[in-house]
């Protein structure tokens, strides 16, 4: 009787086994919101400045990886991403959470670029993330951005409207550290590279499925950015780096 009961229990447990992986229960957005209310903070705020949250990022990363690919909604704001913000300035490649880093910001754009005003609005209804993957729709440019990464590489996939030109803004003067020196150049038809020096040099080497036409330095009276312009020969295919 005991053996029969045990078999019934084991059969029941096996039948209830979930097909989900443990990573299916992970929400990368947890901890990305800033704490404002006294009951959350544990004290009453006496100034209007932004307070602290968990300072984590929702982007794509593997454990102990050299690359963490994540959106920046505001520079010099902990991890660079704050859930309550409404714009994205770029997707950066280094992020340990809490503070600093956020190197090599890239943002897919179309049309004429204004260096001091190129960020895009986004909506959380059109944003998603799970371990190793991040996606968001950039409303200003009509671009769907998808990001993932390996231990040492980042992978970008940008789906533009078929009729739009394809460009990237590389905001090389910005990171969460002060950038003292930077550089970016075309290497060959499908490759560009560069570096940022902000408390240590960070180098990158980017390979594209589209041909790189040129890299232009664009500046106004407030800011300067690099604009990578791509050849349109592939037409409707997403831009991939």
Question: Which residue ranges define each predicted feature?
Answer:
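Bacterial N-terminal signal peptides
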Residues: 4-11
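C-terminal motif of bacterial Sec signal peptides marking the signal peptidase cleavage site
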Residues: 14-15
């Amino acid at each position: 009787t005991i053996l029969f009961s045990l078999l019934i229990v084991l059969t029941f447990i096996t039948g209830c086994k979930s097909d989900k992986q443990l990573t299916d229960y992970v929400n990368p957005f947890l901890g990305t919101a800033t704490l404002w209310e006294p009951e959350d903070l544990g004290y009453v705020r006496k100034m209007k400045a932004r307070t602290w949250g968990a300072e984590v990022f929702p982007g794509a990363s593997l454990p102990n990886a050299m690359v963490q690919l994540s959106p920046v909604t505001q520079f010099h704001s902990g991890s660079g991403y704050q859930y309550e913000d409404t714009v994205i300035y770029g997707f950066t490649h280094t992020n340990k959470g809490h503070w600093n880093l956020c190197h090599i910001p890239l943002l897919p754009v179309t049309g004429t670029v204004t260096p001091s005003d190129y960020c895009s609005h986004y909506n959380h209804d059109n944003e998603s993330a799970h371990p190793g993957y991040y996606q968001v729709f950039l409303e200003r440019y009509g671009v769907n951005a998808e990001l993932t990464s390996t231990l040492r590489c980042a992978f970008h996939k940008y789906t533009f409207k078929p009729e739009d030109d394809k460009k990237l803004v590389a905001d090389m003067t910005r990171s969460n550290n002060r950038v003292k020196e930077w550089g970016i150049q075309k290497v060959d038809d499908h490759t560009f590279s560069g570096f940022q020096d902000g408390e240590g040099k960070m180098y990158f080497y980017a390979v594209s499925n589209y041909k790189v036409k040129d890299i232009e330095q664009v500046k106004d009276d407030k800011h300067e950015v690099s604009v990578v312009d791509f050849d349109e020969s592939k037409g409707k295919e997403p831009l991939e780096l």
